[in-house]
Amino acid sequence: ATSGDTGSAAEYAMRGKRGVRVFMLSPEGKMSAFQRAQMYSLQDDNIVNIAVRGMFDDAQDIVKAVSNDAAFKAGYKIGAVNSINWARVAAQIVYYFQGYFLATQSNDEKVAFAVPSGNFGNICAGHIARQMGLPIAQLVLATNENDVLDEFFRTGVYRPRNTAETSITSSPSMDISKASNFERFIFDLVGRDPAVVSDLWAKVDKGEAFDLSATVYWKNLPNFGFISGKSTHIDRINTIRFAQGRYNVMLDTHTADGLKVALENLV
C-alpha cells in the first residue's frame, strides 16, 4: 500500500522481474497527479495497481489483514514492501548514520533530525539509530493537518481518526491517521512489555484511543528525544517561499512541513 511516494519506487524496482507480481493499493483520488502518473502509467504484466475507495489507512488495513493471515500469506508467498516490513525500517537506519557523518566533524557532536511524518516508519528508524548510540539530540516529528502523532507527543493521547476525519491536504503522502510502526516505539516507551502493547493496540483495532499521560510510562518520554509540531497548507506555502527566497531551493510540500517544524525548534 502507498500514500503516493513509495508505490512507484516499489513498482519500478519490481517491474519486469520474473516470479514476482506486485499488487499496489493506493487511495483513489488522494494522490497528486504526478504520483498517479508515475504509478498508473506502468504497463508491465507483473504490476497491478488497485485504487481503493478511501484513504491510505484503508489500503494499509487491507495489507495488514493479509499479512496477519499466516496461512494465506504462506500459501501464496505474499510479502509486504512498505513500511510495515521490518526490512524497510532497518534499511532506513543507515540514512541517519550517513546523515550524521555528513553533518559533523567529530563523534562528540550531536544533531537533530526533522522528519515529515504520516506513518512512523522513517522516524522510527531514527529512534532505533539513537537507541544504537548515534548522538541524536532531538528527533523532530512534523505532521500536516492529520496530526494524530503530534497530538500524542503533546498530550499522551493516541487517537487514530477514521476515513471521514482524515483531511485531504497539499502534502498527500502524509494524509495518514493510523500510523504504522508506532507500536514499535510504544514498545520501547512502555519498557518493552509486549502485554502492554497488545492491550493498547486491542483498543486501536476497535477504533478506540488510548491515553498514557497519567501513566508511569509517560515520564519516560523525554529520554527518547522526541519533539513534535504541526504544519498547515498556509505554513507549507510560506515555508516554500522562504526556502526559495533565502536559499534558492524549491521544496516539495512534505519537506516544507518538516522544515517549518524544524525552524520552530532550533536550539
Model regions and ranges:
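PLP-dependent amino-acid enzyme catalytic core
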Residues: 1-267
